[in-house]
Structure formats: C-alpha cells, structure tokens
Design a protein with these regions (language model features):
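Short, positively charged and aromatic/hydrophobic N-terminal segments
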Residues: 7-12, 16-23
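N-terminal basic/disordered segments at the start of proteins
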Residues: 25-84
Length: 472
C-alpha cells in the first residue's frame, strides 16, 4: 500500500478520536449533565428512592426507536428544509392511560393518512408524517396548582406524572407512571409499525375514506373536485400496472413519532449511544421538541437536547425575537444541518402578522437551515361562555393562512403544520363545516388537557391547506 496510505490511515484515526473528544468532552455533555442546570416544569417526587428505581428500570428496557430511524427522519426533514417536502405533525394534546386502545390509535393513523394524501396530491411533493404519539404524555402547566370548589391541589401534568382525577392521592407525582408510559408507548409503536405495512395504508383505501368524507352535506361543492382528481390519478396508476403487489409505496407508508421532551428523567433513561456512530440518541421518539415555556437558552431542556442527535423542534410564541431563535439554532444545531431543527410558530391569529415577518427577515440573513411549521392551536385558545376551554376553527385557519402568506411574501418556505387533533368524533373545537357551537362542546368533550380538532375538522383543514400549497 505504501507509506502515504499508512499516514492517511493514522490521520483518519486521529481525526475520528478528535471528533469523539469534541462530542463527549469539549461540549461537556453527558446524558445526565442537564441536572446541573436550571430546570422548569418538573414534578416534585415525594420519594427519591422510588424515582431512582424507576429511572434504573427504564435504562434496562429496549429503545422505543432506533438511531437509524431518527437519521432517516432527519434526511426527510432536510427535504422539507429545501422546499421539496411538507411536514404534517399531529396527534393528541396529551395521551392518556385510560383512553388507550387499538381503535383510537387506528383512527388517528387513518386521519393522518387521509390528510397526507390530500396534501401530497395538492403540493406535488412528499409529506413527512410525524405523530404526536407513543410518548406525548407530559404537559407543562401555567400554574403549579389547580383549585376547584375551594379545594387546592397540584396541577395535573399528564398521565406520565400524576392522575387526572381531582383528589389528593391522584395528584401526587408517581415515578412508576414513567414505566407504564413506556409500555404503552411500546404497544403504540408496535401498532403503528403494523398499520404502516399491513395494508391499512393502501392509497386506494385512504382515498375511499376521503370520498366518504365529502359525501357529507355541503362538502362536495368545496372539496369534491380535488378528491375526484385524486381518484382519477390512482385509477391511471392502476391501469399502468402500478399496484400494491408490485409498488410498495402504494400500500405502505412511514409514520414517525414525536413528543415534547419535558420530563427529563424519562428522556435521560431512554437516551442511548448508537453503536454505529458513537452519537447519542433519545430513543423515546424519532423527534423531540422543546416547549415555549422551557426553551431558556441556559436551561436544562436546551442543554439536554443539544447533546442528542434526533431531529428537534422548538415552539416559538409571540414574545420571541429573531435573536432568541438564532441563539437556539446555534445551541441546538451548531453544524447548521438541514433537517435537524424545526421552528414551530405558535403566535396566534391576531399576532402572527405583526411578529413573524421581521423574524423571518433577520433569520434569512443568517443563512440558517430551519424547517418552519405552524402550530395554529395554542395561540388561539379561549374560554367559552359555558366554561369550556376551546379553539375556533376559523381562527386556526386564519393563522395557517397568515403563515403561508407571510412566507410567500418573505421568500421563505412554509414547511409544515403541527396540530392537536384526534381521529375521534369529539366536540372540543368550535366551527368548521359542521358548525359546532359552544353549546355543542358538552356533547363529547373528552380531552384531559387542551381542545383538539376532531377527525372531520382535521381533514377539512387539510383540504384547505391543500389550496394554499397547490402546485399546478
């Protein structure tokens, strides 16, 4: 081989060692180093011994996802970053132990596929499907306590932490709930993998569901043309010999998982070193995000996620500045990788027009690779006259419309949408073609946290977004 080859080999080994030192040493990151930082929105467990036992148990359990899958998602999101794909992220506000069953998971999977096929056809580009599922249990709260009828108890923080029932026993944080959340997430992952490859994702079947949707009163006139054009396209593909037996893309799909990485003891315990690359991945989900309340640049959540190699999201509210986002990008994506960072805008229909354009202009000058998506739910939450927390469909749509209009005006790419939704026929958000009123909310108000779009509202929103991304 010669001396030059040997020298090059030695240099490669040294460079690899330097890279490992940089990753593990100079960054001063380990999966438990977040414990030295200021942290918000964490429960106070009464029994530290029980907490330690639960953490150690989680560390022995298999990963819920694999590093290679997270890398695949990053590659898919890189296409979104380049304007060649679209991100559809959606699911429950907060998963619960009591409502866990195969039917609910199937129905959520179905409505995501229905939305995705509409968006794919309209946008002429792949849709990256990411569920708020298989781990979306913990919820940040605006107050540490909740009061009902003069009784004050700790706030409900999600089933992974404490119980929804309003009594003193249920509201005590229990670390063993992390174990139950893990096993439920594992079961959910198993179902999602089966649904993705077991025939439920067949494009013809998904389109038939959509045709059933537009048969409902007043919907055919609005959305029928797009649905029928899609039917014609699928029929043409079939005539050309492209079917489930010879074209896997017709009957199979990929659905990734995500959740807010809020409860850091759980996330730490499921963070593993990839045997192929030596990089650390949070194997509780393919993608994690940091909430608006916990995105402090010097706080524990940003520090923890800076060290894992999953794709990451950050929720951005109306008080954020471009400098805040630039600082977060430098901390979470120092290599400026396309597909690594998703900025999720959640400003509200009344504020996005004033705040977002300036932010986009400043960030554009920095040349940062960012996937921009819109969360039109959190900034549009109101309290109805009858006491129910709700969201108006028209306000949700208005923020989505503004998001696309602003990106178009600024020459940037509106890359996706992030929704709290369900496959069930709940009555939690008002409006839509079925004109749910505040009086209707009591019929099937089932959320344990924030109001969700029901299956019809979510699909209708997809048809309306299709008009915004439509390419002739």
């Amino acid at each position: 081989m010669g001396p030059n080859f040997e020298i090059l080999s030695v240099i490669k080994v040294l460079l690899a060692k330097i890279d490992v030192i940089f990753k593990k040493g100079l960054k001063m990151w380990s999966r438990d180093s977040w414990r030295k930082f200021n942290i918000l929105q964490q429960p106070s467990y009464p029994d530290e011994t029980e907490l330690k036992k639960a953490e150690e148990k989680l560390k022995t359990l298999p990963p819920l996802v694999f590093a290679g899958e997270a890398r695949n998602l990053k590659q898919d999101l890189a296409k979104v970053c380049e304007g060649e794909a679209f991100l559809l992220q959606g699911g429950d506000c907060a998963e619960s132990f009591s409502n866990f069953n195969a039917v609910n998971i199937r129905d959520m999977f179905k409505v995501m596929l229905q939305m995705a096929i509409v968006l794919t056809f309209a946008g002429r580009c792949p849709v990256v499907k990411v569920g708020r599922v298989a781990g979306q249990f913990a919820k940040p709260r605006s107050s540490d306590y909740e009061e009902q009828g003069g009784v004050k108890l700790p706030s409900y923080r999600g089933d992974i932490i404490n119980g929804f029932e309003f009594n003193a026993k249920a509201r005590v944080p229990d670390p063993n709930r992390m174990i139950e959340a893990y096993y439920q997430s594992a079961s959910t992952m198993n179902l999602l993998r089966a649904f993705s490859r077991g025939g439920l994702a067949d494009l013809h079947e998904v389109n038939r569901w959509n045709l059933g949707f537009i048969k409902k009163p007043d919907l055919d006139a609005k959305y029928g043309e797009l649905a029928r054009r899609l039917s014609q396209t699928l029929a043409f593909m079939e005539a050309c010999g492209m079917n489930a037996s010879n074209t896997p893309a017709v009957s199979e799909t990929k659905v990734y998982t995500s959740h807010e990485a809020l409860l850091l003891p759980y996330e730490e315990a499921l963070t593993r070193e990839d045997s192929l690359t030596g990089d650390w991945y949070d194997c509780s989900a393919h993608m994690l995000w940091i909430g608006e309340r916990t995105r402090g640049i010097n706080d524990a959540h940003v520090h923890f996620l800076s060290g894992v190699h999953n794709p990451l999201g950050v929720k951005i509210g109306p008080n954020a500045t471009a400098q805040d986002i630039i600082a977060l990008a430098n901390a979470l994506n120092p290599q400026n990788e396309a597909g690594r960072l998703n900025v999720i805008i959640r400003m509200g229909a009344d504020k996005i027009g004033e705040r977002l354009p300036k932010i986009l202009r400043e960030i554009k000058r920095e040349g940062l690779n960012i996937v921009y998506s819109i969360d039109p739910m959190h900034g549009n939450t109101i309290k109805a006259a009858n006491g129910y927390k709700t969201r108006e469909f028209d306000k949700i749509l208005a923020e989505v419309q503004s998001f696309f209009d602003i990106h178009r005006a600024e020459g940037t790419y509106a890359g996706g949408v992030h929704l709290e939704m369900t496959g069930q026929d709940v009555t939690e958000c008002t409006g839509g073609s079925f004109k749910l009123s505040q009086e209707d909310l009591a019929q099937r108000y089932e959320t344990q946290c924030d109001p969700r779009l029901n299956a019809d509202q979510a699909l209708e929103l997809a048809f309306l977004i299709a008009e915004l991304i439509k390419k002739i």
